[in-house]
Regions:
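Terminal peptide-recognition signature
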Residues: 39, 54, 93
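Acidic/glycine-enriched edge-of-secondary-structure segments
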Residues: 42-56
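Short, hinge-like loop/turn segments at secondary-structure boundaries
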Residues: 55, 73, 117-121
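Short active-site oxyanion
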Residues: 32-37, 52-53, 73, 99
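Short, flexible helix/strand-to-coil boundary loops that buttress conserved ligand/catalytic motifs
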Residues: 29, 50, 114
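Catalytic cysteine-centered active loop of the rhodanese-like fold, especially the PTP/DSP P-loop
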Residues: 63, 68-111
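Glycine-rich, highly charged phosphate/nucleotide-binding loops
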Residues: 55-63
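Flexible, polar/low-complexity N-terminal or interdomain linker segments that lie immediately upstream
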Residues: 1-36, 43-45, 119-127
Length: 127
């Protein structure tokens, strides 16, 4: 077998530096890390349910992003493991100078882990 260990090591080191998972993100939220959570799904899906504290930045809003920070890590997520919206948004936002990471697995994985979800009813009760 011809395997390039050096390239593989670089690939996984880079991947680990710029991605997170639901468990890690929940830990960041619990520790009140100085991050911005960015949901890049369609607005209707965002309104229905989202990661608590997330802002919505759907495709079409990436060129002039509102609510992001160039001083904080912006953690992006989309629908599911097959969705590429978060990585597309990451590329666009990086080009504008925003530090980003992607939560792998998307919102469906967040829910599958039993992580907290914010919904209109939950938001209304919390207010």
């Amino acid at each position: 077998m011809d395997y390039d260990f050096t390239s593989a090591a670089r690939h996984f080191a880079a991947k680990n530096a710029f991605t997170t998972g639901p468990h890690e993100l929940a830990g960041m939220i619990g520790a009140k890390a100085d991050i911005v959570i960015v949901d890049v799904r369609y607005p209707a899906d965002f309104r229905a349910s989202r990661i608590p504290g997330a802002i919505n930045l759907p495709k079409g809003k990436w060129e002039k992003p509102a609510g992001l920070s160039k001083e904080k890590l912006n953690v992006l997520y989309c629908y599911n493991p097959q969705c590429h919206l978060a990585s597309e948004a990451a590329s666009a936002l990086l080009a504008l100078g925003y530090p980003v990471a992607e939560m792998e697995g998307g919102f469906s994985t967040w829910e599958a882990f039993g992580s907290p979800v914010e919904t209109p009813a939950a938001t209304a009760v919390a207010a």
